[in-house]
């Protein structure tokens, strides 16, 4: 037996790897299984050029054997094995990757790839084991060797009888502590869960002897224990299968198996890319919003695999926030991993994959919009708000990606329409895309501000969600047509005769409007004759970037109480109320003041805004009734 020291800065570096690099102890099994898979891959590559070596895939597997009584966990593979020199080179030098060296020396063909990159995964076993023993026999050696270490300073190596080629790793599992339950790594159910989670798509069978119960023969209630060897992993991932061989049911089953949601997906996207970066992906657009979707607790991201091995549960960098509802996975052989294989280095490949995925999602949603409008509207009901947030955020930089996906209720069509559909129906005389805001389409339909636009025969988009107008403000225009609120001070559709009559009316009643403006000086910026009202007596219009609807939303937020829209009180000069108002101005200043307050409060109520003093409002009505 030889005793040797680690060649790298042993204790300090090993301690760093055990305690700092890996964030989850269960990762050790993933790393050891990946190493075992690498070892079998190496035989496969040798067989490509060595005619004397026959690669029969059925002869190659990985076996996991827990022994609770002895606190031993064995990981056995039928791979290429290691010579004494390779044991010292690969296990005696921390951060030395045998897989990487093999990969550099051989041209990889036939869709296979070696998983290992850094050679540190093996040492993750010291997170759960007090002693690690490696017994290996190389395909190039007549004898086997045993390598053993406690992970403290060095290791021992000695010849060992081993009949078959391959490697057996023996972990003596640590005793439990108050903080750590190491015994769980000897439980069948726990080991199965870890394998399914991280290594389900390793291309070779991962086998375990599973203990179970069954009815004894010729018995109805007497059970017996039995042990059955089972293959735990799926081996062939769905994303590597030919799309033409898969059915919608196959994708739906995968969606349910991965627990992406309890609904059925609206759409699946299967990507196989071989360009600047190679990757496979299966993405799903859910039917319903998760219960926590619009909360801080919700985490976006796709499962990320490196050559079939799960390395991240939720890689947020692969999805923009506005597509955070998308579920699924990405598998690539080209990713640059960091030393622990748990995290990605933010490299060009990841950005390319993310950009490609974004474009694929956009294209699929556009296809759904055109080919299955009912299904798209159901999707939009669930996630349309997120698309609008995507336009509003980041100063509108994403509007070109998202604007064609938006739907709004149309006053003319009485259904949801796209901006492009709205534009296609515009007459030559219509300059703007008109919209109205409110809590519901029923309330918007009753708004006085819609009268003139509707009379002109122009279509109005109804904005009923809090985010709607903020998104529209960021969009500013669509295909060179500006958006215009029906509450805007200038609608751009008043004819010259109306303009002339309004100017005349305002000049004749200049002092009246000045008096009303003075009485409401802390509430409105001006009072004037309305160009838009037809049957209603009064309404509010606004000037500036903050609309009345935006004021309602912003003022409800913390520290935003003082954000106000620049309101204009508009009076219908053709309404009987205006005649009463003029009479009061001439003959009864007290009544004129009451009328002014009442008309303003009436306009507030129409907009769904609160009255400042409901008691005073009620008293004013009573005074006028007496």
Curated annotation (Swiss-Prot):
GO terms for molecular function: ATP binding; ATP hydrolysis activity; ATP-dependent protein folding chaperone; unfolded protein binding. It comes from the Bacteria. It is found in: Cytoplasm. InterPro entries: HATPase_C_sf, Heat_shock_protein_90_CS, HSP90_C, Hsp90_fam, Hsp90_N, Ribosomal_Su5_D2-typ_SF. Keywords: ATP-binding, Chaperone, Cytoplasm, Nucleotide-binding, Stress response. One of its GO terms (cellular component) is cytoplasm. Molecular chaperone. Has ATPase activity. Homodimer. HAMAP family: HSP90. This is Chaperone protein HtpG.
């Amino acid at each position: 037996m030889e005793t040797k020291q680690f060649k790298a800065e042993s204790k300090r570096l090993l301690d760093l790897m055990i305690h700092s690099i890996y964030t989850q102890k269960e990762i050790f099994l993933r790393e050891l299984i990946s190493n075992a898979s690498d070892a079998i891959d190496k035989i496969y590559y040798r067989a490509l050029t060595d005619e004397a070596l026959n690669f029969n895939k059925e002869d190659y597997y990985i076996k996991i054997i827990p022994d609770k009584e002895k606190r031993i966990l064995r990981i056995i593979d039928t791979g290429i094995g290691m010579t004494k020199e390779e044991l010292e080179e690969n296990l005696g030098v921390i951060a030395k990757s045998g897989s990487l060296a093999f990969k550099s020396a051989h041209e990889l063909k036939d869709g296979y790839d070696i998983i290992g990159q850094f050679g540190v995964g093996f040492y993750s076993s010291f997170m759960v084991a007090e002693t690690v023993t490696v017994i290996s026999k190389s395909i190039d050696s007549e004898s086997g060797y045993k390598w053993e270490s406690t992970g403290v300073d060095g290791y021992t190596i000695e010849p060992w009888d081993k009949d078959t080629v391959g490697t057996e790793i023996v972990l003596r599992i640590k005793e439990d502590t108050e903080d750590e339950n190491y015994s769980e790594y000897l439980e069948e159910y726990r080991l199965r869960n870890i394998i399914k989670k991280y290594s389900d798509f390793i291309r070779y069978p991962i086998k375990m002897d599973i203990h179970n119960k069954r009815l004894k023969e010729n018995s109805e209630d007497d059970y017996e224990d039995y042990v059955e060897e089972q293959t735990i992993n799926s081996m062939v991932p769905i994303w590597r299968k030919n799309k033409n061989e898969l059915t919608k049911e196959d994708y739906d089953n995968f969606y349910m198996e991965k627990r992406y949601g309890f609904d059925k997906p609206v759409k699946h996207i299967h990507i196989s890319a071989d360009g600047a970066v190679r990757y496979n992906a299966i993405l799903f657009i859910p039917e319903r919003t998760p219960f926590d979707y619009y909360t801080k607790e919700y985490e976006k991201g796709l499962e990320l695999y490196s050559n079939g091995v799960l390395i991240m549960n939720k890689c947020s960098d692969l999805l923009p926030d506005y597509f955070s509802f998308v579920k699924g996975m990405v598998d690539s052989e080209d990713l640059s991993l960091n030393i622990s294989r748990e995290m990605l280095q933010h490299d060009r490949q990841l950005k390319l994959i993310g950009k490609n995925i974004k474009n694929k999602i956009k294209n699929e949603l556009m296809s759904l919009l055109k080919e299955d409008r009912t299904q798209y509207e159901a999707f939009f009901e669930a996630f349309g708000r997120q698309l609008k947030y995507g336009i509003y955020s980041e100063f509108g930089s994403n509007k070109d990606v998202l604007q064609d996906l938006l739907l709004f209720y149309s006053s003319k069509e009485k259904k949801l329409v796209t901006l492009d559909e709205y534009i296609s129906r515009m007459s030559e005389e219509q300059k703007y895309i008109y919209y109205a805001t409110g809590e519901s389409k029923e309330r918007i339909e009753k708004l006085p501000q819609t009268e003139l636009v509707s009379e002109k025969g122009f279509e109005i988009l109804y904005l009923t969600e809090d985010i709607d107008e903020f998104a529209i403000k960021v969009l500013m225009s669509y295909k060179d047509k500006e958006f215009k609120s029906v509450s805007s001070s200038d609608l751009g559709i008043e004819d010259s005769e109306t303009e002339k009559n309004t100017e005349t009316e305002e000049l004749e009643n200049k002092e009246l409007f000045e008096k009303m403006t003075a009485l409401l000086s802390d509430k409105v910026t001006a009072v004037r004759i309305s160009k838009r009202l037809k049957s209603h007596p009064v309404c509010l219009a606004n000037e500036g970037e903050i609309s009345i609807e935006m004021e309602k939303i912003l003022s409800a937020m913390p520290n935003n109480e003082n954000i106000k829209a620049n309101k204009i009180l508009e009076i219908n000069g053709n309404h009987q109320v205006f005649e009463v108002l003029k009479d009061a101005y001439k003959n009864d200043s007290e009544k004129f003041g009451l009328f002014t307050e009442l008309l303003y409060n009436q306009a507030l109520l129409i907009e769904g805004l609160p009255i400042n003093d409901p008691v005073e409002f009620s008293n004013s009505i009573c005074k006028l009734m007496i």
